[in-house]
Regions:
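Class I S-adenosyl-L-methionine-dependent methyltransferase catalytic core
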Residues: 1-279
Length: 279
């Protein structure tokens, strides 16, 4: 990870993820296994765009980027590979509009690796900001309930089983695919436009996968220039302490690692890496 990038800390978890979505997103959204915190998307949109600008999310999931964009008077386009989540994203956008959001948004069903053939070519060179997040290994969110007598029941903790989904591809394929997506995003951006990517490290068979550093390399390979690094907190700030907001699955991974002798700590932030199209 470069050490010379400007660095900021964003207090994006002053409320729990549930509180951030309550009354703003439909209940159907809960089932997605890896949702971006609304405050992260909202803060990025406020920082890198102006009202009336166009925002794109090539892997939009339940439409968090789109919802936060239209609530701030921006227009948005989202691409989603899985039909289930594309439908939820559309419903969330309609819900936002019913609440008075002034921006407009479109959800396109398709594979972001074919972004150039999916999105209307008329917007090429007009996009102010791309926000997205690559799939990041096993640390998805999901739902869980303890069973009587021990154990837990898990649900909504995995992506679909479609082998073409980037979430199921080997790391090398994931990075190649993400580089291709960023390359096509660069063509959509206006000169000086921004790409903001959330990423966090994860472990595979005990080995640390430094996804944030890999994301920067993908961006540079796609012709983008690293601009800023923002620490988007996943824990609340209270005076001189933090309030952990660790998911059941993240806590389980930490406990399992510690039992195996690996001194793992729960992650309290995501990197929001900002790159820029040359002017």
């Amino acid at each position: 990870m470069p050490t010379d990038l400007p660095l900021s800390v964003w207090p994006t978890a002053q409320q729990t993820s549930r509180a951030q979505r309550s009354g703003r997103y439909l209940a159907l959204s809960t089932a997605h296994p890896a949702k971006m915190l609304p405050a992260i998307a909202a803060t990025a949109i406020a920082a890198y765009t102006e009202p009336g600008d166009l925002v794109v999310d090539p892997m939009c999931g339940i439409g968090t980027t789109l919802v936060e964009a239209v609530h701030q008077g921006r227009d948005a386009i989202g691409v989603e590979y899985e039909e289930r989540w594309a439908n939820v994203a559309r419903a969330n956008v309609e819900f936002a509009r019913s609440q008075g959001a002034s921006g407009s948004a479109e959800v396109v069903r398709g594979d972001a690796r074919q972004l150039a053939s999916i999105i209307d070519p008329a917007v090429r060179g007009l996009v102010a900001l791309v926000i997205t997040s690559p799939p990041y290994g096993p640390s998805v969110h999901g739902q869980a309930n303890p069973k009587p007598g021990g154990g837990v029941t898990k649900w909504d903790h995995r992506y679909s089983t479609d082998p073409k989904n980037l979430a199921h591809r080997p790391l090398e394929d994931l990075l190649d695919g993400f580089t291709s997506i960023l390359d096509q995003c660069r063509e959509l951006l206006r000169p000086g436009g921004f790409v903001a990517v959330t990423a966090r490290p994860w472990r595979r068979d005990g080995e640390l996968i430094d996804l944030p550093a890999q994301v920067l390399r993908c961006g540079e390979a796609a012709g983008l220039i690293p601009f800023e690094r923002n620490v988007a907190l996943l824990a609340g700030l209270r005076d001189d302490s933090i309030v952990p907001r660790v998911s059941f699955f993240q806590l389980g991974q930490v406990r399992k690692a510690r039992k195996g002798g690996l001194p793992l700590l729960a992650i309290a932030h995501e990197d929001l890496l900002v790159l820029r199209r040359p002017k």
